[in-house]
């Protein structure tokens, strides 16, 4: 979707959040994102992650060599990828996207700091990352790509016209998370199905697995909460993640958050 979205817009940055590098050849990733960067200069971001990001079956299907377990060589893959975007292979003349390292563990912060890359912490996977973000800042090594540490945070956030309506439509995400923690990966359920599930489980509508958080509420409440999370991490950018069953409600959620932060453009300006 990066190409079509970039083609349909002219101002916003578009990117991956992210490419799970262990599933792919670094050269192939470099080729794909170099082409996108050549087509849309200065607008393409490449977020790189290490997690499987999918079920065991799909991870196996993506495996580079199914005859043996995939090696744990993520750092070597990152070095190779950055080499293509850095000195690179002269004959290929790669265009470079902006590369960030995504993570939810202390090790990801170590790598981001060592490589001198922007760091995006997945609070929606593993809350409690401010200490990890602080480690990244303290140990950051300036690079050609980045002279100072830069932290972003990705967080669950869901806005609706009222606090109660936001809480209601968040039931789909809560059912998915509870099912995932029990080892079941399910499609996004309807709000009605999710509410019935929570009722059957005798779980409050605002229930979540221990340690997880979903920001819900009116646009103003969500804005205040997102600003608080950004301050907690010292983040200059916030990635909003949500799971909503109805596509129109999901779009409205993003519109409400954008309006709360006054991110909307005038009718005459391009996106």
Q: What function would you assign to each model-found segment?
A:
Residues 21-27, 125-132, 159, 246-248:
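Acidic-and-aromatic substrate-binding clefts and catalytic sites of carbohydrate-active enzymes
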Residues 22-86, 127:
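Flexible, glycine-rich active-site loops centered on histidine and acidic residues
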Residues 16-23, 215-216:
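The substrate-binding groove and active-site-proximal loops of carbohydrate-active enzymes
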Residues 60, 66-84, 88, 129-235, ...:
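An alpha-helical appendage that flanks or caps ligand/catalytic pockets
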Residues 5, 36, 112, 166, ...:
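Conserved, mostly hydrophobic/aromatic
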Residues 14-16, 44-48, 97-102, 117-122, ...:
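Hydrophobic faces of well-ordered beta-strands that scaffold small-molecule active sites
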């Amino acid at each position: 979707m990066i190409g079509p979205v970039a083609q349909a817009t002219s101002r916003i940055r578009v990117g991956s959040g992210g490419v799970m590098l262990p599933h792919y050849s670094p050269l192939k990733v470099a080729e794909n994102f170099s082409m996108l960067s050549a087509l849309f200069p200065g607008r393409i971001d490449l977020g790189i992650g290490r997690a499987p990001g999918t079920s065991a079956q799909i991870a196996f299907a993506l495996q580079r060599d199914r005859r043996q377990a995939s090696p744990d060589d993520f750092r070597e893959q990152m070095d190779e990828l950055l080499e293509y975007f850095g000195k690179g292979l002269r004959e290929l003349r790669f265009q470079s996207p902006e590369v960030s390292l995504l993570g939810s563990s202390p090790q990801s912060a170590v790598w981001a700091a060592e490589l001198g890359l922007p760091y995006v912490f997945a609070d929606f996977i593993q809350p409690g990352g401010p200490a990890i973000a602080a480690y990244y800042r303290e140990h950051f090594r300036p690079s050609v790509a980045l002279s100072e540490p830069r932290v972003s945070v990705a967080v669950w956030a869901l806005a609706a016209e009222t606090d109660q309506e936001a809480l209601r439509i968040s039931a789909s995400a809560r059912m998915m998370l509870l099912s995932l923690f029990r080892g079941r990966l399910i499609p996004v359920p309807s709000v009605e199905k999710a509410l019935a599930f929570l009722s059957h489980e005798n779980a409050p509508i605002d229930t979540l697995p221990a340690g997880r958080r979903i920001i819900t509420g009116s646009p103003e409440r969500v804005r205040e909460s997102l600003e608080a999370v950004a301050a907690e991490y010292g983040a200059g950018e916030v990635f909003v993640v949500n799971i909503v069953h109805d596509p129109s409600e999901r779009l409205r959620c993003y519109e409400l958050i954008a309006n709360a932060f006054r991110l909307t453009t005038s009718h005459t300006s391009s996106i």
